[in-house]
């Protein structure tokens, strides 16, 4: 039977099974504990209880084991029955233990999002030239050079936007099937948009949408553009052609696209290469998220749980990057 003490003796296995190191687990437990206790107090104090607080069977799994159970589920994405076999409990117990923890991890993930208040001040030194009206000079889709300086202190100079898709089980309802079918992936998917800075730290996550929705349509309806600091450079792939029209006063860096009879010239190819060298950080961030099988395998659960799962893992990935950046800053 799997237990925290047993796994702790094998740090390599611990990280392989949970997706995080023992130190990361302890830091996460310290954040989960006060929120879990507050949620339990609220639950026990609710009106209409049929049993007095403290009554009923006592669980043999403390909060540490419940968090471990949840992390195993997120990392390996086993069925509740399989997780129950690992921990020696029934699948209903797994569901009952992991549900509240997942909601707390989701809330912790949300807490890591957002742009820092000082982002605009940090970007001010690299503002594009202003026009006579005092605003930033409007940019064409590809007329601006991508930022070439990536600051080691994690300053937000660039907002890199991309969407990730995950396969879901096909619905029995035809209308739902049609909405979820992604022509790009040739499968039924759920799509989520991510926005990261040049360090790969996730600053914004959209609500998930059916896979048939185009990336640029998701961007326009997500509210992401309204939440961006006003002077930050927006960077995306060629699928987002047209966003420069949505924000004419912003600096926008998009790659050139070749067309029939109009191949890219060397300068355009170099421009695209420069953008790709910066955009790779969002691909690495998405890969870090998909290290957890719950975001890589066919998602078996309801859409509401999908949003909880991705936000929970976003928080884990962001905290790991924050820790790495802090080490680099201290070196």
Residue ranges and their predicted role:
Residues 82-106, 110-331:
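Short, well-ordered secondary-structure "scaffold" segments embedded in the functional core
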Residues 16, 57, 71, 207, ...:
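Conserved short-loop catalytic and cofactor-binding motifs
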Residues 62-77:
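Short, amphipathic alpha-helical "recognition" segments used to contact nucleic acids or chromatin
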């Amino acid at each position: 039977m799997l237990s925290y003490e047993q796994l702790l003796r094998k740090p390599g296995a611990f990280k392989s099974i949970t997706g995080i190191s023992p130190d990361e687990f302890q830091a996460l437990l310290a954040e989960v504990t006060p929120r879990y206790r507050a949620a339990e107090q609220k639950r026990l104090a609710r009106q209409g209880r049929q049993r007095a607080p403290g009554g009923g069977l006592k669980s043999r799994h403390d909060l540490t084991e419940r968090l471990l159970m949840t992390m195993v589920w997120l990392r390996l994405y086993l069925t509740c029955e399989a997780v129950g076999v690992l921990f020696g409990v029934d699948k209903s117990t797994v569901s009952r233990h992991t549900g509240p923890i997942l909601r707390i991890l989701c809330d912790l993930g949300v807490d890591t999002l957002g742009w820092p208040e000082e982002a605009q001040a940090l970007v001010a030194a690299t503002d594009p030239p202003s026009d006579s009206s005092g605003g930033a000079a409007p940019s064409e889709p590809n007329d601006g050079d991508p930022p070439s300086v990536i600051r080691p202190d994690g300053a937000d100079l660039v907002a890199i936007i991309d969407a990730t898709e995950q396969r879901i089980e096909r619905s029995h309802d035809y209308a739902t099937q049609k909405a979820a079918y992604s022509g790009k992936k040739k499968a039924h998917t759920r799509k989520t948009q991510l926005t990261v800075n040049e360090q790969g730290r996730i600053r914004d996550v959209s609500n998930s949408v059916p896979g048939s929705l185009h990336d640029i349509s998701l961007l326009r309806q997500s509210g992401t553009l309204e939440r961006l600091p006003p002077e930050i450079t927006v960077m995306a792939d060629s699928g987002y052609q047209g966003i420069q029209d949505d924000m004419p006063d912003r600096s926008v860096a998009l790659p050139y696209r070749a067309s029939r009879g109009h191949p890219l010239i060397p300068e355009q190819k170099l421009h695209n290469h420069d953008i790709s060298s910066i955009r790779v950080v969002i691909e690495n961030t998405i890969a870090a998220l998909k290290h957890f099988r719950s975001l890589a395998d066919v998602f078996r659960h309801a859409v509401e749980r999908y949003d909880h799962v991705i936000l929970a893992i976003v928080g884990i990935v962001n905290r790991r990057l924050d820790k790495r950046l802090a080490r680099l800053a201290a070196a």
